[in-house]
């Protein structure tokens, strides 16, 4: 009897020993290399190896936290490869969330700084940002990712699906911070905040950075906090790295201190990876790295099972995972608490968040409102927090808003090898109370174009968002006898155009990503010109035509092009209908009599540009433009051509006067093949055709050799074309382009040039 009893007792003790055996998983940091951790987890799960605790640093903290919230390895891979993950790590806002209604007009600026309106009038430059990656995406994304798990855990990381720890670095006090509780999103984000790249999270008045600075492989934390029976470590960092000229590698070596990437044999096992060709942000390689991690771990399964006798079937794990996810509270918001603002600013911000019939709004609805508010220059940053309200069974939304009171100064223009050297200065101020107001002034000066514009805009609190915009503008543009390479301004202009106008516009959102403007305007347009080039410009006087015009207009537009000059992706569409009435006044230099003609016409213009992705290195752009008008001809041929709409699809065509590409009605289009070398460098071709509906022609009057009578030719009898090839360096702040182009008229019209900057002029009266 005694022997069977002893055997039974031993078996019982072994059973409890095995069933009580606990396993801890430790994941190192390493940026995109950390995707190998996914394969490690997948191999362990499929072979029944339990994971009872998880801890990680940096990328290991991201993957560890996802696992602790019930994500499977395949779900984590899908998230890492998603477009959203790419937006988070770059700070780029996807087009669906760009609030086009408040998008400012493109300007040729490439440097910005601001002047704080305080007693000291401090000047802050934006040349060196606080972080290379804009935190605008992470601020909202991490709240959406982690709020539900934080709520269910009651801010205690032991209450997650898998108990979790992560590491941050307090560089001011030179110590490691272990996150055991608090906001899970803040914990993970601080653990992955690589200096200079990401903006730090503040805790107890101290900024926290990437935990890998002091402890990139937290085996000690797992042992101290969880006391597991077995530790399995996955290390994607720590291998010997040869000295490199890559600045990113050099910064990593400077910042990261020594970490021991080992697990003592008596404590467990480790799998180490060496990925010398994978950089910090190459997450597109995640599937390849996951497969490597999976195969390496599979090769160790037998050895692991000799140390870990306990098994957890994958079906049982997945059932627990589903039950955990179903128990998470729904991410719905009701109460809003705003800090960092005045009472009137709080009212404005809360008005941007529209609740449903139950007084709630979803994360998706908040996301739209979040990016909408950040389109206001006055709002510098919004840091959202979601706190679960157990009484109401929804979340309270806390918004820490940073408001600026400053004048924004923009400087830019264009440096060119031809007649397109421009200097630009822009000043802007935005006021925010119960209403949002915009005040802007910009000045351009150059040897081809000069102009000044003042505008004021107020966004009204109406059921449908709307604004009123008042603009006052003056511009002067001249066209000279020569536009040759390295042109010096010695030759006089043979055409000078001036515009003075005022516009009042009512703006409204149109559909989702467009806006409509209903406008009234009054302007005086003046043209000084010679009606022939067969004269001595220096000794002759200009003919002059001026137009006092009133216009009513409707404009609908959308624009998702990725850059303001030489785009490679996106779409632009606009439609403008306008009715114009007024008088034409003409005075010829050799005739004292001034002629006056009444003018009335309706004009419709439309443009469509779209860039399609053919493959990773080739884009194909397609462009179409048309103008339909009831406009009559002016007093003479030159006046008619000058006031006819012009087709100017390239930067160079905007600063040259080419009568062959002007008509009151026309159809134009083109193709734009773009060959991408990398993110900053591409080669492009632009090929366009232009066909007037009725070409404006001239009849020479024998009695007046310097005056030509205009008339319309036959329909669709003329066709012109232009082409341009360009090598473009698209830097983050400026565009550099070397181009060569040609026009079908006049013959042998070829040009080569270099531009550094942007050729973008102020809007014109009849735009």
Regions found by a protein language model. Give the residues of each.
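C-terminal soluble interaction/assembly domains
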Residues: 356-360, 364, 705-716, 722-724, ...
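Patatin-like phospholipase
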Residues: 20-57, 65-382, 386-388, 401-405
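Flexible glycine-/small-residue-rich
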Residues: 168-171, 273, 338-342, 401-405, ...
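C-terminal outer-membrane beta-barrel translocator/porin domains of Gram-negative envelope proteins
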Residues: 408, 549-678, 682-695, 700-710
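Bacterial Sec-dependent N-terminal signal peptides
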Residues: 1-23, 767
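Short glycine-rich, acidic/polar surface loops and turns
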Residues: 218-219, 251-264, 670, 710-714, ...
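Gram-negative/organellar outer-membrane beta-barrel architecture
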Residues: 364, 375, 381-561, 565, ...
